[in-house]
């Protein structure tokens, strides 16, 4: 099915160049229509990578919220941009990003305490399905027998954590950015 979909997409693109930016072809309008209908969003933007999408989302959050900080959670991956690479090997001392623990009441307390400085919280919704492990790769996700390392109780706890995080961000007027590229929708 995957190969057939890719072949159909390639055929629909015809003789267009491999890089298409902007509404240059009717199929792009079709895709925009589908994405806005499915997502319920008024606007959709295309990016060349997940890193670019996160950079744009963070920039928009900082501009619109008029606050400097972003929050991310330990073990999550938000691209190659040094603004979200706070681990070993990043020579930049990231002063505008806080890295907190997933599913921790102390993290929620920190966000609440620093709400006047925090523009956005980045979270990877699938992280809780594989605690302590990197998210699954595309090949694994295409397998219909995908298993997670989380049991149902852990998945339920993570769902509650995400709901608490969403409620806190709404209350504190902080943008909550779900960085999710593994489920096939490819929206950050």
What is the meaning of each model-derived region?
Residues 139-187:
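Catalytic PLP-binding core of fold-type I/II PLP enzymes
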Residues 1-23, 32-44:
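Glycine-rich phosphate-binding segment of PLP-dependent enzymes
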């Amino acid at each position: 099915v995957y190969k057939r979909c890719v072949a159909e997409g390639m055929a629909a693109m015809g003789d267009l160049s491999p890089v298409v930016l902007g509404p240059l072809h009717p199929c792009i309008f079709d895709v925009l229509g589908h994405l806005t209908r499915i997502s319920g969003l008024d606007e959709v933007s295309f990016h060349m990578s997940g890193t670019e999408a996160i950079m744009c989302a963070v920039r928009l959050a900082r501009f619109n919220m008029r606050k400097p900080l972003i929050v991310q959670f330990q073990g999550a991956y938000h691209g190659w941009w040094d603004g979200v690479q706070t681990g070993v090997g990043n020579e930049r001392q990231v002063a505008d990003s806080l890295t907190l623990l997933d599913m921790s009441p102390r993290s929620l307390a920190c966000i609440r305490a620093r709400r006047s400085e925090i523009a956005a919280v980045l979270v990877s919704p699938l992280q809780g399905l594989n605690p302590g492990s990197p998210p699954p790769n595309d090949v694994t996700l295409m397998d219909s027998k995908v298993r997670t390392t989380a049991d149902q109780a852990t998945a339920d706890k993570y769902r509650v954590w995400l709901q608490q995080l969403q409620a806190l961000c709404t209350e504190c007027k902080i943008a909550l950015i779900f960085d999710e590229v593994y489920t096939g929708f490819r929206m950050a």
